[in-house]
Amino acid sequence: MSIWSLWVLDLVGILCTSRIEKIIEEVKKRYEKALSHELSGAELEIIRETIEEVVGLDTKVLIPFVFHGRRLVISPVTRHQDIEQGEREYVEKVVKMLPILVWNSITCIYVPGDSDWTIDLMNEIFKTTSFEGFDPVTLYKRTRGKCGMRFTDVVMRTFRHNIGMLNRFGQRLAQEAGAKIQEISSSLSDEEKRKEEKMLQIIKEYGESLCTKEKQEEIIKAQEIVCDACTYIWRRPEDRASFLIEAYSRYLHSKTVEVSKHGDIDEPLFDYVDHCSLVSTYEKYKSMDIVGELFLRVFLEGKDINDESVNDTVCGVREREEAEKMRGEEERRKKEEESLRNALELLRMEEKEKSKGKGKKKKGGKKGSGEVTAKMEEEKKDSEEVEESAEAEVSLEEMAVGGARSKERSSKKKSRSKGHRYKVHKRVLRWTKSAERIKAELDEGSEEKWRNKSIEEIEEQKKVHDIIEVCVLLRSLDANRFFVSTNRYMKDGTERWKMVGVGIFEEGGEKKVGKVEVGLYRDKGEGSVIYHLMFKAMDTEKAGKGARSSFGKGDDVEGLEEGAGELSDMSGFEYPKGVRSEIVKGGDAFKIVYRNPKDTSEVLRSLTVLQKAEVL
């Protein structure tokens, strides 16, 4: 399913309506806000065609993670007794909503032009169904021996319980779609009648399929695979970190653009995955390594499940398994060599002790001299440890700006706790200049996508690229609390990777949730160089116009060697005279406030980098 289609389906839940003109207007508004330019007539026509053609069926799955503020309170493997006491009441409210959330996941259907009737039908079936005897909260709290249900177990029990309603829903859906085919207005043109009938026929057939055991089992199996995939991801720390950054940014985005239907309760996230493709991939490979990695890619990179994404995943997993096998063999070899070295060293020490014993018999030493020497050595060692401890107390502020050490500290040794070191590429520093100078450099540069941009476009791009103050955070000891590193890849003979954090960009009273992207590569001197730095709004990623996922491998930046001779370590960096920005550091946020240079009391915009979600 295309990224446009996913966005349209997302909007159905937000708008609580399905009039096509209203959806187009909402898409237009969000697209223009995200990309900071007006859509052309051709672009609007593409949107219209996409919305008119798409019919959203059997694509939704529930992601078994629950956030409360900046805390992750439920993971796939969380049991009720594992939940922090202060969060249990909130968690139980979320779990109580599972029946309606699961029902929405199973039956959410987007009908181009008018979905009101399907939404009304969905609500009617749910409200007239008795849930007597099924209480997900009681189920979750129940323990058998010392072990209770995991959150994914409760989710799946709820799915299986709700599947019983699908027969009634499917029958009514097919009946009403059939009736609407007979009622198609004669005032429509032949082409419009054809489109309307085709769409309703698809829905009628889908309703009939929902009554079949095969379709019901497919829905259950798809959600079960997602739950298992999320558990697989959760148990791999390197994957968990990236997954949580993406999930947390989606959670924050949903809070800024949607009004909660359940008051102060934040429901679990949903994603759009083709059920049939997911199930068939699992049936083909029977490997959670492959399916778990595939779902991770789909979730992080916004990809569809198709032959290309499946093949890429299979190759990636096999390469990783081979690398892990080679690494394991190398570690075993090193352990064997180390054991042999230790054995030889022990043998040499024993022989040395024997030779010392023989020497003492021939020549006696001065009484107590050995004890004095040992004491002196111990005092010297303690003195060195105190000196090293003092060295480690270099302040974060000094390290962030590359400042000199305090005079009281030794200048002969380097602090072990010094922050991260990064050089900054010319293409990043370019954005600190005026829009006119940036345009001149881009027009003469080798990057085709940046040529011939208007001054207005450059000024808008400058807002999200001129965030060089983020380097202060990147170089600090706190960087790992805000950013995760992605997998590394090779391009043009250089090793590249990204660091990604969650950010909120504010301007003119509007907030945009997104990610702070940092692109890095390893230079010939084995140093880390920042060649890409920007804030990317979630709406920009959803719009998909030339936008790449923050977690996707690869990029379109070439010719890094062009600016390699003009790298900077950003020590003591200052903006040109007259430009003002202020850094505000808090416990869980790093905020950059940009002010009007002519009137510093006026805030133009701000960027807040948020600490990673806390896992309870």
UniProtKB/Swiss-Prot annotation:
Organism: Encephalitozoon cuniculi (strain GB-M1)
Family: Belongs to the UPF0329 family.
Residue ranges with Basic residues bias: 357-366, 410-422
Basic and acidic residues bias: start-end ranges: 319-340, 347-356, 374-383
Region named Disordered: 319-422
Superkingdom in the source lineage: Eukaryota
Protein name per Swiss-Prot or TrEMBL: UPF0329 protein ECU10_1810
Biased composition (Acidic residues): 384-396
